């Protein structure tokens, strides 16, 4: 996807046609409300509460990994935005829309929180993430590829944190 964005390839042109067809296809108030789920002021308190819950239940390492995963979001998203310098759907003069930081924030915060509290909440976290990304596209804040790239990035961030958490649990069990 990144390569297609950089060279303005056929996938990017399809992305632009899809965006033009769906922007403002739902009431703006609804798409704005959905996209706001990716704001730090909404997503970060959810993750912080789940981290506090995990610490309270003796899972400090898991809470640490969730916090580090969230810290990784801007460390990865901002350089990609700078590198690709992709203009926005409604603001062709502005740059830095690829990948979507709101989508990555929502995914890492909500899925991370779900893993910390109860794995049964992961489907709800996935729905919140999907609603966020859909709202961003329908409102015209992001292209669909911006959102898809952030989902891929979120899987990488969460996967790296998950591997670290699993290995720390295995180490604790074998040493105990």
Residue ranges and their predicted role:
Residues 45-47, 53-120:
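Membrane-interface loops
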Residues 89-176:
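Membrane-embedded catalytic cores of phosphoryl/pyrophosphoryl-handling enzymes
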Residues 3, 19, 35, 77-85, ...:
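Membrane-water interface at transmembrane helix exits
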Residues 1-2, 48-49, 127:
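Hydrophobic alpha-helical topogenic segments used for membrane insertion/localization
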Residues 1, 9, 13, 71-79, ...:
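Transmembrane alpha-helix boundary/anchor motif
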Residues 1-42, 81-89:
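N-terminal transmembrane-helix/juxtamembrane module of multi-pass inner/ER membrane proteins
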Residues 24-32, 54, 58, 62, ...:
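Membrane-helix interfacial "entry" motifs
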Residues 26-29, 72-75, 148, 152:
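Membrane helix-loop-helix hairpins that form the core translocation module of multi-pass transporters
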């Amino acid at each position: 996807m990144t390569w297609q964005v950089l060279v303005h390839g056929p996938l990017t042109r399809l992305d632009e046609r899809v965006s033009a067809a769906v922007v403002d296809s739902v009431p703006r108030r609804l798409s704005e409300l959905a996209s706001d789920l990716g704001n730090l002021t909404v997503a970060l308190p959810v993750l912080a509460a789940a981290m506090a819950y995990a610490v309270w239940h003796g899972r400090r390492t898991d809470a640490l990994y969730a916090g580090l995963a969230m810290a990784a979001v801007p460390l990865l998203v901002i350089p990609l935005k700078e590198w690709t310098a992709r203009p926005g759907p409604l603001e062709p003069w502005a740059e830095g829309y690829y990948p979507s930081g709101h989508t990555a924030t929502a995914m890492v915060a909500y899925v991370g929180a779900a893993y910390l509290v109860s794995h049964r909440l992961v489907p709800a976290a996935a729905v919140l993430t999907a609603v966020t990304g859909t709202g961003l596209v329908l409102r015209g804040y992001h292209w669909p590829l911006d959102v898809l790239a952030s989902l891929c990035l979120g899987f990488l961030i969460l996967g790296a944190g998950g591997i670290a958490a699993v290995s720390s649990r295995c180490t604790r069990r074998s040493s105990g």
